[in-house]
Every structure is written in structure tokens, then in C-alpha cells.
């Protein structure tokens, strides 16, 4: 838990939330990896990405670390990143995630296996989601997967609410600071044969969902301005989750 709490925090007053040098190097290597892994890569709906505000990209999750790779390489924004907690504790991988300021999240599945208390997980997750929300409100991009885990099923798994709660908190931060409200951006990820080397990938950016700014409660706005995590209203979270189910 101490290692998770000591995860480097992103900075939103420069070009990249993480280290500029390591971020540029990581994305260079990712582009070479994508060019080697895929025979063709196609993007559509780029005109649907608003460039005057932050956005949270949400997609189904069938191809592990390849899924965020396809989204981030095409998106015009720099990204603030979050993911399951072991991304920042595993050897080799943690070297990169810590330099990119990836924020760890402890899922319920990991909590049941032990390693930390529910209170510690709640505090860590609240800090991470609030940090991601601050980055989105500051105009950066972010990608989170509502299913919560990568899988090889032919249908979507039950959606978690973390991405919806995060983007609503980002909207509260933006509204309280006079910035433009961020959007939730549905993304379609398509692979000709998902597990094949040199297959084809198609990334489809759907029309963004503009959040209901007038429905964001004042107590949520005041809490996030104090850097305190408060859960957004359940009805707003569920309506946004149901809307995402239709479009992802």
C-alpha cells in the first residue's frame, strides 16, 4: 500500500501530466509497436473529438494494453492515465507507469484477495479518481474502461461506474473553476482477429456526450474545489452509465 500511496502525482500546468521526456519516448515506442503489431490501423470520427475541453474516452476492453494504445495514439490531447493498481507495482512496467504518472485504482476483485483494508482502498481510489477528474477538467484526455477488466467474451461485461463518477467529478471541477465542461467520448475498438499478429485495427470515435451541467449539485462542486472526493448523485451516475451502454 505504501508503494501505491507514493505513486508520482501528475502535473497539469505543463504539456504532459507525466514526465515530458519519458512521455514522448513512451509514445514513440508505442507508435513503433503499433506499426509492428498491426497490418493496418484506421481511425474514423476524429471530427467528433472536441479540442476545446477535456474528454474521457470509454470503450469495451477485449485486448489488454492494446486497447488504450489505439485510443491514445490517435487522440489530439495528452492523457492523464489511471489503471489497476498492479500497473504501478510490477517490475519493468512500473518503470514506465510511474514516469507517466499513472494513478492506481484498487478494484473490488483485488480487495477481496487481501493486501489492504477497505478503508485504505477507498482513500486511494478517491485520491486517484479525483486526480484523474482534475486532469480531465484541465483539458487533458483520459481513457477508462467501464467493464473494469480485459476479457475475450463476444459481449460486454457488466459496467462499473468508476468512469462515470470520474467524468461527473471533472464536470464539477470545471464548472467551479469557470472552464468548459468535459465530455464523455464513446469509442469503438474493432480488430479483424483480436489475438493475431499483423491483424487490422479500426478505432471509431463516436459523438461525444455533453454532461448535464445544470444537474451537478453545488455540494459536489464545493467538495472537489477543496480536493475532497464526494460521490456524485447516483441517478446521474446510472443515467450516464446506461447511456454509455447504448453507444459503446
Please provide the spans of the model-predicted regions.
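Eukaryotic N-terminal low-complexity, Ser/Thr- and Lys/Arg-rich leader segments
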Residues: 1-20, 24
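N-terminal assembly/attachment segments of tailed bacteriophage virion structural proteins
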Residues: 230-234
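Soluble catalytic domains of membrane acyltransferases
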Residues: 16-217, 223, 235
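Conserved small/polar residues in nucleotide/adenosyl-binding loops
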Residues: 246-248
Amino acid at each position: 500500500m505504501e508503494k501505491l500511496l507514493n505513486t508520482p502525482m501528475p502535473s497539469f500546468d505543463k504539456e504532459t501530466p507525466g514526465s515530458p521526456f519519458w512521455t514522448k519516448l513512451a509514445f514513440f515506442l508505442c507508435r513503433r509497436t503499433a506499426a509492428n503489431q498491426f497490418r493496418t490501423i484506421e481511425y474514423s470520427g476524429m471530427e467528433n473529438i472536441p479540442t476545446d475541453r477535456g474528454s474521457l474516452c470509454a470503450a469495451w476492453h477485449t485486448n489488454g494494453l492494446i486497447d488504450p494504445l489505439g485510443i491514445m495514439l490517435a487522440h489530439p490531447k495528452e492523457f492523464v492515465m489511471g489503471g489497476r493498481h498492479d500497473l504501478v507495482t510490477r517490475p519493468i512496467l512500473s518503470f514506465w507507469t510511474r514516469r507517466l504518472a499513472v494513478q492506481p485504482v484498487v478494484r473490488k476483485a483485488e480487495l477481496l484477495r487481501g493486501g489492504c483494508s477497505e478503508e485504505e482502498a477507498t482513500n486511494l481510489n478517491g485520491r486517484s479518481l479525483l486526480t484523474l477528474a482534475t486532469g480531465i477538467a484541465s483539458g487533458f484526455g483520459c481513457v477508462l474502461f467501464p467493464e473494469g477488466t480485459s476479457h475475450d467474451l463476444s459481449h460486454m461485461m457488466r459496467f462499473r461506474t468508476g468512469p462515470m463518477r470520474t467524468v461527473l467529478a471533472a464536470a464539477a471541477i470545471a464548472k467551479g473553476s469557470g472552464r468548459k465542461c468535459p465530455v464523455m467520448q464513446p469509442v469503438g475498438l474493432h480488430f479483424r482477429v483480436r489475438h493475431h499478429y499483423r491483424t487490422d485495427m479500426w478505432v471509431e470515435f463516436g459523438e461525444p456526450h455533453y454532461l448535464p451541467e445544470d444537474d451537478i449539485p453545488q455540494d459536489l462542486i464545493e467538495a472537489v474545489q477543496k480536493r475532497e472526493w464526494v460521490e456524485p448523485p447516483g441517478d446521474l451516475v446510472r443515467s450516464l452509465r446506461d447511456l454509455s451502454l447504448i453507444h459503446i
